[in-house]
Amino acid sequence: MAASCGSSQLPAAEPPLKIPKMEVLSPGSPGALSDGNPSLSDPSTPSGASPLGPGPAAGGAGLGGGGAAGGRGGASPSVSFSPGGAAAAAAAAACRGMSWTPAETNALIAVWGNERLVEARYQQLEGAGTVFGSKAPGPAMYERVSRALAELGYERTPSQCRERIKTLRRCYSRVKEHGVGKRKSSYTFEQLEQVFGQGGWDSQPCQPVLINSSGLYQELESDGSTMEEYSQEDWGNHSQDLHCYQTGEQELDEMPTTKRTLKIKQESSEDAQKRDVMQNIMQILESVQLKWELFQSWTDFSRLHLSNKLAIFGIGYNTRWKEDIRYHYAEISSQVPLGKRLREYFNSEKPEGRVIMTRVQKMNWKNVYYKFLEITISEARCLELHMEIDWIPIAHSKPTGGNVVQYLLPGGIPKSPGLYAIGYEECHEKPRSPLAEPRGADPSNETPGELEVPSPQASLRVEMESARIIYCYLGIAEVRTLQQCLFLHFQANTKTFSKEWVGINAFLSQNCVVEPGVSPKSIYIKFVEVERDFLSAGSLVECLEKAIGYPLKFNN
């Protein structure tokens, strides 16, 4: 058993108490991972002094309920004056268990960062690679950490250092993943990011910019005080509001306002994006003029032609007061067969079907309808290209003394078959003409300066409209790869032109010739990989034209 913190004074006649080897508390012990508890803190305890007596001990009583025996009491004379001062220090550490003061925790973070960097350099010298993570830290490293803490005035065993590092790594991982924790802490997220952010012994590039003890203590010691003089409350003033997870039974605090606001904004942005996608799908369904079919029974979805088809489908409804059918939901079923997806929307055991059944039972809706348009795999990828793939701008360079611009294709274009699109940023050379018309139909009544100074609303409109990218070509990389096709478009000359590509190639080549002081049009590309066997199926150009709402200029 570890020495009790609250042991009563022993009779003077008894022989000196022998301190057995201390037992390190496991992480599952009550309070073992607590960061601090003001009721048990004693920040005034100087470094090298122990609450158990004048013998050498750890710097400061532990914060939190991590002590193996609970309260703090006077030490017996046998313990205080026994020749084994190191044993008394071990007893003090055992009494604190895994409870760490803010000063100890920050010192551990700094020392661990230094040791981690040294370990990585050793591995480089040994030829083990230039990354953290070639091997996990061993007992020797925790012994070095323990000795380094002792030099700073904090007596901690290698086992305690190992358990505390594991706790800090869990804190960092959970805060990194969830962005929220249980309580405030004396250390900042940036500290953990610099120490554990390189992957935590995973394969990541070696970054020598790590926290060190001198840099960590410099700001706190500049006012003449020492780390031990800071109480738990004072530490809160010198640290950020890091909410980290601990494995004790603690209440989950509310998410900080800034993080909560950021999460709300992120969710609202995602919801807006989903609404835009669904609106686009509804426009596609309306453009092909499909008829609504009334849902009557489960036999509607047992038909063979619904079983394994991909499709664009919509769910609609009407009410007793209005017979017009309105959309409830629309989706491109590009991964799951249409029959399976529709069954989910008409199965009361599924979340989607439960919503529909509830609204019908409560007479919010009168009837439920559905419509669908079968699509091929290549058409599904084409719609994915339009709705989910972002545009990539094409850079260009101008040779010295010439008026011909050269395109610079980005790296990472796949050497595989697929679909690609080329677009350009819409140029508005006359953005002010609609705003100038209300001033009067007679140009003589207008002064030249009036048309040259647009209003703030006009500037905003020009900025918003100029960001629109117009599709002009859809390419199918079936015989050649995506990389080869795009290279032929952007790097071709008159010798490599073909009749099939003369339209888009002529446009791109003409855009390379610019007048002095005039920039070429901004060109963009996007692409998606598709298996070669699927590219020949479907009407891809018409599919994309229906989705974007206008014809492709260079495909016709």
UniProtKB/Swiss-Prot annotation:
Annotated Polar residues bias: 1-10, 36-45
InterPro entries tied to this protein: MSANTD2, Myb_DNA-bind_4
Region annotation Disordered: where it falls in the sequence: 1-82, 431-458
Start and end residues of each Myb-like domain: 99-169
Pfam family, one: Myb_DNA-bind_4
Biased composition (Gly residues): 56-74
Superkingdom, natural source: Eukaryota
PANTHER family assigned to the protein according to its UniProt record, in alphabetical order: MYB/SANT-LIKE DNA-BINDING DOMAIN-CONTAINING PROTEIN 2, MYB_SANT-LIKE DNA-BINDING DOMAIN-CONTAINING PROTEIN 2
Protein name listed in UniProt: Myb/SANT-like DNA-binding domain-containing protein 2
Source organism of the structure: Gallus gallus (Chicken)
Annotated gene: MSANTD2
